A protein has these predicted regions:
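Carboxylate-rich, polar loop motifs that coordinate divalent cations or form catalytic acidic clusters
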Residues: 1-332
Length: 332
């Protein structure tokens, strides 16, 4: 067993506030990613959505090839790759249009359509649609390709036994760059493996949980999505448990968590069986009254605002132009 002591205390936590969003026309959110501009993209039971923090936008049409369950998302430049129930789709986010793929071409041909297999993962470092419907998670490691499937865990096609006898379905894989270990989420348990992938330790406090997704923030907090809510493991191995409470609108909307994603601002996005949820660590807005910038009570009705690359602000309004840099008195 590993030398790392996994002493964990489970805490039922309700103090942290979740902001929940119901998508128009979709219920289950199964994949989340973010583009270079900060836009959040969502794979759902009905197709692709984007979300700008205010509104959701659907990118599918009913009864077409893109009206389909989306299991995984991955960006390569502005091209968004989608692992779906009918194979791989490609959406050019810049042009806001779908690109022709075998899955698109097969949609109108019943015989070819039946041959399309469900795709659950995307290999963004290899052939993106290389894996069949039995593969639920992949991870490139120093030792080779780690694959989680219906039949268990494999490294370079060599089985790794997690338990005696029949192997569990492996739903989620992640490398922990802070703890220098690998996390393996299965139907029934969460395992931690050393970098050699030789020694495995089961996290006893999570026994019996179906672990569906894993992600980590910059402070080393590990987010674990399960059929029993969301868990957060801190660096000291304490465990917090977030669950739905119908009496509290600031809790997660559903206890079945399909996907969790830490964005570039360290907000944690959670895809559930009942929509999208966000645990915010980043404040989207910073409010500064105009008199604190201009040191004047004259006021200004602003019509245009520009921020330069070096962080300076230019603001134009009914009472003239304001030039402002943080820490420097405004000029106007």
């Amino acid at each position: 067993s590993m030398a790392i002591a996994m002493l964990i205390v489970t805490i039922a936590l309700h103090a942290q506030r979740f902001v929940n969003t119901t998508l128009s026309g979709a219920q289950t959110v199964s994949a989340i990613t973010q583009d270079a501009n900060g836009m959040i993209w969502l794979g759902t039971d009905n197709g692709l959505y984007s979300y700008d923090g205010y509104h959701d936008y659907c990118h599918f049409a009913p009864h077409t090839f893109n009206h389909v369950r989306v299991n995984a998302l991955g960006f390569e430049g502005s091209m968004l790759y989608m692992a779906t129930a009918n194979g791989m789709l490609q959406f050019d986010a810049k042009e806001e249009t779908y690109v022709s793929t075998p899955a698109v071409e097969a949609y109108g041909d019943e015989s070819r359509k039946k041959m399309q297999k469900e795709l659950r993962v995307l290999d963004m470092k290899g052939r993106k649609d290389a894996f069949g419907p039995d593969v639920y998670a992949i991870l490139h490691t120093q030792k080779g390709l780690l694959v989680g499937s219906l039949s268990g865990l494999r490294l370079n096609n060599r089985p790794i036994l997690l338990t005696p006898g029949a192997q569990p379905l492996v739903n989620a894989l992640a490398y922990d760059a802070i703890r220098h270990c690998y996390w393996i989420g299965t139907e029934g348990a969460l395992y931690c493996a050393d970098r050699s992938l030789q020694n495995f330790s089961r996290i006893e406090a999570l026994n019996g949980n179906s672990v569906k997704c894993l992600d980590e923030d910059q402070d080393g907090n590990l987010y674990i999505g399960t059929d029993n809510g969301l868990y957060r493991m801190a660096m000291n191995n304490s465990l917090e448990h977030f669950v739905h409470d119908s009496r509290n609108a600031a809790t997660i909307p559903n206890n079945i968590v399909w996907t969790c994603y830490v964005d570039k601002w360290q907000n944690v996005w959670i895809g559930t069986d009942n929509g999208l949820s966000r645990l915010s660590t980043h404040t989207f807005y910073r409010f500064t009254s105009l008199d604190k910038i201009t040191f004047s009570g004259e006021g200004n009705f602003l019509h245009a605002i520009l921020q330069t690359r070096n962080g300076e602000w230019w603001m134009g309004g009914t009472n003239g132009l304001i030039h402002y840099s943080e820490g420097v008195r405004a000029q106007g």
